[in-house]
Amino acid sequence: MKKIFILAIILLSGTAAASAQEFLTINPDVRTAGMANASVATTGGAYSVFQNAASSLFSHNLFEVGFSYSPWMRDVKKGYDLMAFGGFYSFNHKHSISFGTRFYREPKLSPDDEDYPFIPKDENNNPIVGIEAFRPLSVSADLAYSYRIGRYLGLSVTARYIRSSYGELFTNNALGFDVAAYARIPLNRMLEGAWVSAGAKISDFGFTFDDSNYDLPTKFSVGGSLFAPIRDSHSLEASVDLGYRYSSSENKSFGMGIGVEYVLMQMIAVRGGYHVADSHGYDYGTIGAGLRFMHLELDFSYLFAAKKCPWRNTYQAVSYTHLRDH
């Protein structure tokens, strides 16, 4: 009973925007983070397993791997950190295996920290004594398989194991799944090298273990993207995402993100985007930049929003390597 009560205190705390399960909603791909998180139909990359694994079938590369770091919600409290590793291997663009893992750290918890909302208390609302200070940790491990049907369509299924630990208090475990589709149609008759794509995904539906009250942030997303080469070494990609997030709690929201990426000389990328949401979400803008040198790509993004948005002034950094081309 005590364990269930403590869990309820944590899940109902309104001052923390990213609870144990909500780290799954943070986009670890810095490239699309700079495009207002419009990612379900964009060009596939190392982080496709978190966005739309089927898009990896249409990548120019047969193998990509990447690492990203996101110091999250610094305006709320220091100590929220997301680290992610992702990649894929494509078998002649007919089959692909995508993989990834995420580590999400929250600020240190201590019963003596009176200004922190996650103070563990008993049924009488008294702080529980004898509990050592600790940093909550959430981890996910992802594995996806994608299959290409014909020239234009790819399908994927992703399995995800999630574990959130609150020290000696309790541990939550869950298993989630994604199902996604990605289609790309070339527009060579209109412009050589141009294409249009569409994507759809249902993410993070599944079940929990250990009779926990874990609430997976199930989401349905659809989107489209247009890629157009400009001159010899320049290109433009514009993307839009529509998403509806559903959970059994009151945390339901609808949002739309629009993002643009301009690449100069196939080396320097400039990105921007804006996301709008209903009354249950937040509006925000993003900017980003990228630099590619040989097989190494470095990216940066920054999120700006009104003071009420806990994600404002968040930046993300990433480096990843393309190890094998066609």
Predicted feature locations:
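Sec-dependent N-terminal signal peptides
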Residues: 4-13
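Subset of outer-membrane beta-barrel
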Residues: 19-324
